[in-house]
């Protein structure tokens, strides 16, 4: 039996030696599938619909009623959830070398790969060879704007495959200028905790991206910038947001606003951030404080016949009546807007303070300037004027028709508490009418910010309850500055209007929020 086993094993061994060996299977040929995309310059690291920067985040409780005063992570190159804008105004870092572009070899097959990049000037650069693995198949490079040819070479042993794609590297430089309706006043990053947990005499610490200006990425321009960023992987968006609560044309946009700690005009602040880069898009909200927004509210809260009364304080002090002051200040707006236009790609720029005499900011070919009309905060859900606290419905109607309506009649009939009719001539038009008229400057007025609330059958004013798009009086609720400003719903409506006015149009889905 043992002899048979030995003989059998010998026969098997001889058979194995005598059979020809199967040829080794040839390695699969490599395939090159080059792809590219712009790395976002307006980042949303947690998908909550708001930009996250690199300016630091509270060490604890960022979105609570009272976040930690200690900030962490500033300048580490990582956008943390709920992290402030860089310097309170910049979405991400600008680099003279260009903008970050992701080169994607992940759908390719092979062992190793390199990219060869031929730039707009014809210069060629080849990246270091890397292993083609899931963790290493992506490469980020800095490239200047313009047309590039990207060639991906993939190798396996001595075999290789190369394919090229054209890449139009493009970063949209967006600048937000203006007042509280642009800065996001009343909408700090932790606004939701204030809305749900705050109350009468509550203790609340707003978490702003910029404290002096009450600036927040919950403001409409920042929301629109993020929507623009997310609209295409082939462009990135850098936001420079210098809007500041309380700003006017002279004290804010074109000059220092020392009352809010701004030693330089917004124009000069932008210049120092972007240098000689060309701007692609400007959003602008200004004029409300120029015509006496705060003075009107103060007067009408204390005087039942405020339009014919003497302004108690503020920018309209010295005018014989509130109506006369509003009309006189409205008449100054066309020249004020023209001065701003001079600084945005015009022939001369007249700013005061630091930067006086500097050249205008450079605008890119086809750049858009989007001034926003102010929303209607005066009407109840029924469409009737609000009768709010000590402000009479008649005075709400007067404010709406003589300040906000963009196509007013030539006169306005006002009825006093004594039932005495007074006819007001509107020779200077209205604030929103003057903003709409900036088409003459080559601007594109954002009318949707008005029409959504002002032309609708349903009112969304300060007395509209759950349908309101603006805060009422918040003086006793821990954030007095929010009074009579757009609430989160109102900022979203303005952001939607801004995005819709962009070319090409950008749509913000409510599901994104």
Spans of features found by a protein language model:
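Secretory targeting and sorting signals
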Residues: 1-28
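Beta-strand-enriched, solvent-exposed domains that form extended recognition/catalytic surfaces
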Residues: 29-173
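Mobile, glycine-rich extracellular loop/lid and propeptide segments
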Residues: 94-108, 116-119, 161-190, 217, ...
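Short amphipathic alpha-helices and their capping/turn segments at secondary-structure boundaries
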Residues: 163-176, 261-282, 336-368
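Conserved SGNH/GDSL esterase-like catalytic core that processes O-acyl groups on lipids
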Residues: 196-331
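A structural motif corresponding to the C-terminal end of an alpha-helix
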Residues: 220-237, 329-370, 407-448
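Alpha/beta-hydrolase-fold catalytic nucleophile elbow
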Residues: 285, 372-373
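Catalytic His-Asp segment of secreted/periplasmic serine-dependent ester chemistry enzymes
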Residues: 374-508
């Amino acid at each position: 039996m043992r002899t048979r086993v030995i003989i059998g094993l010998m026969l098997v061994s001889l058979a194995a030696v005598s059979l020809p060996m199967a040829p080794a299977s040839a390695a699969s040929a490599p395939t090159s599938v080059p792809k590219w995309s712009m790395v976002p310059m307006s980042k949303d690291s947690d998908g909550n619909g708001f930009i996250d920067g690199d300016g630091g985040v509270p060490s604890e409780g960022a979105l609570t009623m009272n976040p930690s005063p200690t900030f962490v992570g500033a300048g580490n190159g990582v956008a943390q959830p709920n992290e402030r804008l860089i310097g309170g105004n910049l979405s991400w870092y600008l680099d003279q070398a260009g903008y970050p572009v992701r080169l994607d070899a992940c759908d390719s097959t092979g062992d190793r790969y390199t990219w060869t990049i031929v730039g707009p000037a014809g210069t060629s650069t080849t990246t270091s060879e890397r292993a083609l693995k899931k963790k290493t198949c992506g490469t980020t490079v800095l490239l200047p704007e313009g047309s590039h040819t990207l060639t991906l070479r993939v190798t396996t042993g001595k075999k290789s495959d190369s394919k090229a794609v054209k890449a139009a590297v493009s970063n949209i430089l967006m600048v937000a200028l203006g007042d509280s309706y642009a800065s996001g006043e009343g909408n700090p990053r932790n606004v939701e905790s204030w809305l749900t947990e705050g109350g009468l005499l509550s203790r609340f610490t707003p978490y702003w991206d910029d404290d002096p200006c009450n600036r927040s990425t919950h403001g409409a321009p920042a929301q629109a910038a993020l929507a623009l960023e997310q609209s295409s992987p082939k462009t990135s968006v850098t936001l420079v947001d210098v809007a500041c609560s309380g700003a006017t044309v002279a004290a804010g946009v074109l000059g220092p606003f020392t009352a809010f700690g701004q030693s330089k005009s917004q124009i000069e602040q932008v210049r120092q951030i972007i240098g000689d880069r060309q701007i692609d898009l400007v959003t602008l909200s200004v004029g409300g404080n120029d015509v006496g927004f705060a003075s009107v509210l103060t007067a009408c809260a204390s005087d039942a016949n405020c339009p014919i009364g003497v302004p108690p304080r503020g920018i309209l002090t010295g005018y014989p009546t509130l109506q006369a002051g509003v009309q006189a200040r409205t008449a100054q707006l066309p020249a004020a807007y023209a001065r701003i236009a001079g600084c945005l790609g015009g022939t001369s720029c007249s700013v005061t303070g630091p930067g006086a005499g500097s050249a205008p900011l450079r605008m890119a070919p086809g750049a858009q300037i989007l001034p926003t009309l102010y929303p209607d905060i005066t009407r109840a859900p029924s469409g009737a004027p609000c009768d709010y606290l000590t402000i009479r419905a008649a005075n709400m109607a007067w404010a709406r028709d003589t300040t906000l309506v963009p196509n007013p009649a030539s006169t306005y009939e006002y009825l006093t508490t004594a039932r005495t009719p007074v006819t007001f001539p509107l020779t200077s038009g209205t604030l929103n009418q003057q903003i709409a008229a900036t088409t003459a400057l080559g601007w594109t007025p954002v009318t949707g910010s008005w029409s959504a609330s002002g032309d609708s059958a349903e009112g969304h004013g300060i007395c509209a309850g759950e349908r309101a798009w603006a805060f009422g009086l918040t003086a006793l609720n821990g954030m007095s500055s929010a009074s009579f400003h757009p609430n989160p719903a109102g900022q979203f409506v303005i952001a939607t209007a801004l995005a819709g006015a962009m070319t090409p149009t950008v749509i913000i889905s409510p599901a994104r929020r």
